[in-house]
Amino acid sequence: MESEFSQSLTPPVSPSALNHYGESAPSRPPCFTCAYEAGREDTGRLSSNGYISRGALKRLLLKLDPAPADFGGDTVDIFDFPWVTETALVESTKLLFGLFRQKVLKLETLVQSSSHDFGQASSLHYEAEELRQQCVLFLSYIKVFIYRFLEPSQSLDEGPVHPFKDAEAQLPSVLVEELFSITLLIGRIGNLPANVQSAFTIQHQGKLFPPSWQLLHLHLDIHWSVLEILHLLEQRMMGQVVYAHQFVNLTGETLTNISLFEDQVNNLFCDLIGLAMNKYNKVRPTETLNTHHYHCLCTKELWILLIHLLEHRSKSIHTQSFWSYINALLQTVLKGTTSGDRDPGFPVHCKDPEGFTWWLLTHLAQIGMHNRNGTAQQEKQLEDNWSFVIGLLKSICDPKKAAQEEQIRVVVHCCLSLSLMWGPNVSAVTTFWEYYSKNLNSSFTVPWLGVSGLGSICRTPLCLLQQAKSCCSPAPVGSSSHTQLYRTANSFHIFLRILALHLSQEHAGGAPWRQIKGRLYSKFHQRRMMELSDMGLLHFLLLFLVLAQCAELEDVASRACDLLAMLPTNSTPLALRALQWRGQLALVLLYLEKGLDVGALAEQLAVYFSQAAREFYLKTTEPSRKLALWAPLSSYLEGVSEVFETSPNLTLSEERLLNEGFGLLLPACRQSELSSALGFLQTVLAQLRRVHQRCGQPSHSVDSPSWAPLPSVAKERHQAVAAALWSHFFPFLCSMRLSQTPPPQLADAAAGFTLLALDMPGSAPQNLQPHPIQSIMQSFGWDEMLHPLLVTHYLNHLLQNGELVSWVSSGQGSGSAQALCVRAWIRCVLQQYLHKSPDAPDARAGRNLDEQLAELTRQVFRLPEVEFVLQRAGLQSAAVKDPKAAMAVFLKAVGRSYCELQLLSERSSAVSRALEYVGDILKYIKPYLQNKSREGLQLAYWTIGCLVKHWSHLLATSKAQQLLFRIVDVLLLPHALLQQDTAAHTQMLSALKDSLPMFLQGLSVAVSVSHSQGAYLKQQQHSVISQYLSRFLPATPSTGAVVNHPVLLAACESTPSPQGERLRKSILHVLRENFLQFKGLAPPPRLAAVLCFLLELLKRNSDRDPALLTIPLPSVLRCLMLVNEPQVKRLSSEVTQLIVERCTAAVGEQPCEHTTAILRAFVDENEGVYDQQVYNVLEVVAVLHPFTVAALIPFLTLSLRKTECKRGLGKNTSLRNGYRRLLALLGDSGQAEMISLEED
């Protein structure tokens, strides 16, 4: 070492000469750096100051000047001294290298002496950076000097030789010796102290780095620069071997530039692999492709540099390729021993040598995808290494090894990555297939992964096909989907991706398929098929679906079906049969995608389904067996549903999947199973209609696939599908329509058939012709025996369809369709309480019915006919949402619109239409009258009450009278209700009490307008009033009971009207004839209550007609005369007072003739019997209105004298005294009559 520094350190050029020569100030040479750059960490972009980004690699490989912009001056500043550019390396080789070693040692000393004092961080950083830059600059100068100034050695002629020439000739050998000494000085990366190696993990967010970071990256710079220099030297020497003479002479070893390059490459790879091995020991299998093998981007860049340099040398001078070096070292790792005597320099005991090898190979292949600019490319930049990989693969797949799934999954994952980067390899595919063909029944799960690692059983054919398709389109290597495959897919699924890659090679002309077709098919035969478990069968299906997608579809599908047919029908577990059907239906879906006819596949599958359905239908089949059979049957339903939903045109024999098996399956289904089956039917019906409608659109031909048939042919195929549906499904729906527990899907399915008949009327069976829509709606919407839930759901589905509403309004054969829809709505509203129960399931059904009724109400009010009726009546329906209130609005609208009609013909038509709306309405409510449901009776009586009130004019016509008579007989005057001792009709009376006012008001109007049956109606009206006046009248006067009496409420009105007056007149007649008649001297029962009722009736109405008011007056006067009970006396007096006042007010000051006539009759009737009582009664009247009694004075005086004459006893003093008291109340007329009496 001392000899190197024995020469003078005086620079060869004096400072005074600098200006003359023109000193060169070279720019900073490229170097390895991890300094932070925005966006670099996220994208993995290499440093902008590195060898690749600065173009050093490209210039090296293209034999260009390593630094064309640098070292152009006569002198160069190296290690703080100026040197002559063209001669410095020749003249001062050992001096320069000595200075270089001095700087390296100084940096090492700085690392050892550095502390964690932040105050010194800045100074240490800049000092270490300066030392490193000086070393890198020197190495860059060596490269430039070799490229520009070094001449190949030539044979020297005998004679004296200039010392410079001699030194120049020896320079290559000296360079090799010095480079070797540098490698000895810095040693191996793996041997660096731990504190230096830890710089790999420094977070590079700041701008200040410790000396250890600078030293570590200087080592990387030196290792790479040595290789660059040796490569440049070899180029300049034109392939001549350069020997290091000093080492040959001293040690006897042969050191050349070639051997030094090889040793340096091997040592560098050993160090890099050792670093990667240390990192791999912390990598979980799930992170295999997520975790890179390099510690930082500098080592990544070093890998890229080595790959391109070695591949370039391999192609240009036929040296070892990159993979040759790596394979030899990895073999050492796998064997665990060193190859030969050379120490590879990395730990030979790895926790998982094979896993590490696969991991490193995969990531090196990824690194190999980078071009000379450091950019990742789609095409491979590095030749593949399949020969080595296949050897590894055969080793891991050896049955003797019994590798676990977690190991196999890593291997397959890595192989997939390699296939994506290098292109598939048939040997890899066949090797894997040999392994998987023996292990198809395995679940390929990794226990410690939990649920995320379990293989998923595809529940539907479409799901199965999608899983297979996902294997046919593997994600790019760097994507998240690809890196997460270890978690999301098992090893078999990953193998299928490799297989698909192999089969999908472009420009291969089918060769990949021919290469492996025999190998794949030969593994399956009847015994092997019978050995398959459910997991094995799933893997079989996925395999063949991938083959069908990527190879010859028809050939693969035929082979798969033949193999599946080998499974015995009787002994195959039903779960396997379900999976088998899903697989075959997935093939059908694939056929549809390709536009191929599915007839053959569908026929075979439909036969299997029909056999299973027949067994399901038989009553001899055990319940447990039926339950198990439902698994494949439901799979078939789901799969066929997906077939129809997927098919773009339904022209590829899809109807073959719909056979007589459905006719056996549907009747045998339980409730939940039937829901699934009917849901399937809805899907098929909807898809058929959708496709058929699209087929008729002009734009259809533009959007259709190239294989789509002509519209006429398509419509024929649609007729075939429709025929299968009508034949195998519709009869069952008809058999279920009268069920008292209809499934919700029944209505939807029936509606689907109705709309199908609308779109394709010719497809309907003969028994529904010539008007199929009307026939179906009669069966499922208008029949009075149908459950309301079915009707509401069915009509809601239909009336939302604009085309069907148009047909209902004016379509051919529609007839009274709108009226029938209204009638069905009214019936459903009326019968809603027949099917409601407090039990939980029924309660849910009740809520469902309420929702459906509300929706049906909205739809019915949108019918054109209903809208017209409401508009003509001037009623708004927008705010009416409650079905009960909406029904009242509709009935009111019908009645009002009838009253506005003038022409007799219009009125006659309106009556007929109105009767169509309600139908046999009494039949709808009959169940309530039998089971005495409180809510039902309330609704029934309230509805019919509205009907009678608002349709009174209409019901009085000859066409509708019978309905009115039946209403009175059934609801108001039923025979059972007339039996006073019956206690079972409390609920009925309660309901009637609330609605009776509407009945009485409507009857009153009907009586007044009826021409043919007015007398009979009037008699019925009196009977109703009499019956319920008595029923609801309390025994003793009770203000609440009397005030809320339904008959009283019916008669009261704020504004007098002729209809109200007629009703009150009828009530007064009933009161007089039935409730105020004395039997001899005995007063009528409940007299006080009756008088209280009469008083309220008169008070709450402002009638002024004396003829009406005086109807009860004779009876009231009699009560006043004969009954001494104080309450009766008071009430009678109040009634009399009210009548007399009203009558007097009506006629003015003159006596009322009606009142006078009644009083005269009263006196005449009771003279000679109740004379004194008569005068007492008249006194009451006289107090109220003396003029009325004064007009009777002549008649009273005559009556008195007649009475005395009859008795023959002369003057009756007591009688005359009573008369005088009366006369005293009558003013002047009374006084004059008293004088006249005195004169008698």
UniProtKB/Swiss-Prot annotation:
Gene Ontology cellular-component annotations: nuclear replication fork; site of DNA damage
Disulfide bonds: none
Compositional bias (Polar residues): 1-11
Subcellular location: Nucleus; Chromosome
Stored Pfam families: MMS22L_C, MMS22L_N
One BP annotation, GO: replication fork processing
UniProt-listed SUPFAM superfamilies: ARM repeat
Swiss-Prot/TrEMBL keywords: Chromatin regulator, Chromosome, DNA damage, DNA repair, DNA-binding, Nucleus
GO molecular function, one term: single-stranded DNA binding
Chain intervals for the UniProt region annotation (Disordered): 1-26
Main location as per UniProt: nucleus
Function: Component of the MMS22L-TONSL complex, a complex that promotes homologous recombination-mediated repair of double-strand breaks (DSBs) at stalled or collapsed replication forks. The MMS22L-TONSL complex is required to maintain genome integrity during DNA replication. It mediates the assembly of RAD51 filaments on single-stranded DNA (ssDNA): the MMS22L-TONSL complex is recruited to DSBs following histone replacement by histone chaperones and eviction of the replication protein A complex (RPA/RP-A) from DSBs.
Subunit and partners: Component of the MMS22L-TONSL complex.
Family: Belongs to the MMS22 family. MMS22L subfamily.
UniProt protein name: Protein MMS22-like
Gene: mms22l
